[in-house]
Amino acid sequence: MASTSSQGTPQPAPWRASFLEHLSKMDSPEFVFSSLHPAPKNSPTDFLPRARYCIFRGFWAELPENKHNNAPVNERNYESEMPTFTTDVRMGKPLEVFASSSGHADDRSQTQGSGGGGPCEAVWWVKETMVQWRIKGEAFVVGPDIEGKEGEKESSGVRTVKSEVGSRMRVVQEEGREGWSWSKELTGHFGNNSPGLRGMFCTYSSTCRAWD
């Protein structure tokens, strides 16, 4: 179980209810995620914008129910206004989130775990309501190292994620809170993906075979 900040608990955003209501009308909750990609050497700027379509997987700590997901999931102890999506470390997004952060990772070997914090922007166009939603902030990666083996020292990336993301989570249910787990939340998100998508995230020898 990883700690989350209880000081200065954030209040629900005033736009939260309308945002979720609008997204519930979409056939597929697609949005455009924009981040900053390292520019080529000798470029007049350090970064170039990159955008791609992603699927909104719910707010962090509010994993949507899925009857086909057999993974263990957390109790609904927290809620937030932090949009989530799933990606593969081999894709460009994790590198961009790390490279444009204060840590300035410049190699993929430095982006294999939790961390990041680079600037980002997400845009939803809800044609059913003719409303555009835009959220700006910092993006963080929650990776398999988010809860290492007992006795292992946490990486700086893990500490950053738990501090920055944890401070934006608010308690909605005290009962069972001690059992809430970052790793369980991550596994739950993986289990909510379709079997085909889960298979694309893994090599043949990896544990994703257990989800078939």
Predicted regions and their residues:
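Binding-site signature for planar aromatic cofactors or substrates
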Residues: 1-212
